[in-house]
Amino acid sequence: MARFNAAFTRIKIMFSRIRGLISCQSNTQTIAPTLSPPSSGHVSFAGIDYPLLPLNHQTPLVFQWFERNPDRFGQNEIPIINTQKNPYLNNIINAAIIEKERIIGIFVDGDFSKGQRKALGKLEQNYRNIKVIYNSDLNYSMYDKKLTTIYLENITKLEAQSASERDEVLLNGVKKSLEDVLKNNPEETLISSHNKDKGHLWFDFYRNLFLLKGSDAFLEAGKPGCHHLQPGGGCIYLDADMLLTDKLGTLYLPDGIAIHVSRKDNHVSLENGIIAVNRSEHPALIKGLEIMHSKPYGDPYNDWLSKGLRHYFDGSHIQDYDAFCDFIEFKHENIIMNTSSLTASSWR
């Protein structure tokens, strides 16, 4: 505990430096959090009114740490990066201290040693609202699909097209992928294929699966102290470089969903550093999963998240991308966004 406190004291000094740096960045835009229902109670986009749905002060916060190289940590150490440049563990602890009334989830995966698992358990004991959820404790079979089925469906669809409109390169590529899967692992699925490369696709894919479960993930994992969470509830995912400075309060989001938007040099883009949903199996995320089930090489960020959101809210794409980013953006004055951009991300 003394070790945690000493580290936390050091990091508070760094937090003040980061705040000073961010205050000098003219492209950082935030607004005051919505702590009471807006007078209109809805927002319009692409000619449709969407209700502003609440995420109350007990909606769990979720951080994620998937570690592909646990050996870089001590055998009895918490396997989450915690350096002066990248104080990710301290950011999580900081959130648990500020948001004492909320459950703070840490969604983890990796070939951890017995001592590292024990250290994660000790973290839960020291901060009673922190709940460590192991990826292996959750069942995702209801969201899975065999790769052979995905490939065969795409081959049938492509071959049904006229020769002039058919993408022959894609067709041949899918046929080759089907041949490889049938030869090497006919039972391979969308989920098992994302366990091969322990990189950002692995990280992004399982984040989306967790968000489909929402607060049900805590109940499924049997975490104590979560009895107050309602089945079918949502959660707020934060990258570990997102720094809380105060409580988030109750949030009101269009149809109960919002994500982080990066704004740099007059360019905006949807980012998965923050994803908030007010319910499990949000239809926008289900739409993205349908895209993953229908594409031969779906990407969990570009297809599942970005395209899934756009198809759900603006299927005909009558609104431009910037307008959609403005509509779906998660904003809050009590979060310093993407602090690793001030140093360098150490997740690799």
Swiss-Prot record:
Motif residue range(s): DXD motif: 239-241
Enzyme Commission number: 2.4.1.-
Effect seen on changing residue 65 to A: Abolished binding to UDP-N-acetyl-alpha-D-glucosamine
Cofactors that this protein relies on: Mn(2+)
UniProt-annotated binding residues for UDP-N-acetyl-alpha-D-glucosamine: 64-66, 88, 237-240, 338, 340, 345-348
GO cellular component annotations of the record: extracellular region; host cell Golgi apparatus
Active site: 271
Keywords recorded for this protein, A-Z: Glycosyltransferase, Host Golgi apparatus, Manganese, Metal-binding, Secreted, Toxin, Transferase, Virulence
Effect of residue 260 to A: Abolished protein-arginine N-acetylglucosaminyltransferase activity
Documented activity regulation: Protein-arginine N-acetylglucosaminyltransferase activity is inhibited by 100066N compound (flavone analog) and 102644N compound (a substituted isoxazole).
Subcellular location per the Swiss-Prot or TrEMBL entry: Secreted; Host Golgi apparatus
Reaction catalysis annotation: L-arginyl-[protein] + UDP-N-acetyl-alpha-D-glucosamine = N(omega)-(N-acetyl-beta-D-glucosaminyl)-L-arginyl-[protein] + UDP + H(+)
Chief location bin: secreted
Binding positions for Mn(2+) per the UniProt entry: 241, 338, 340
Domain notes for this protein: Adopts a GT-A fold and acts as an inverting enzyme that converts the alpha-configuration in the UDP-N-acetyl-alpha-D-glucosamine donor to the beta configuration in the N-linked (GlcNAc) arginine product.
Record-stated family: Belongs to the glycosyltransferase NleB family.
Protein name, entry field: Protein-arginine N-acetylglucosaminyltransferase SseK2
UniProt source species: Salmonella typhimurium (strain SL1344)
Gene symbol of the encoding locus: sseK2
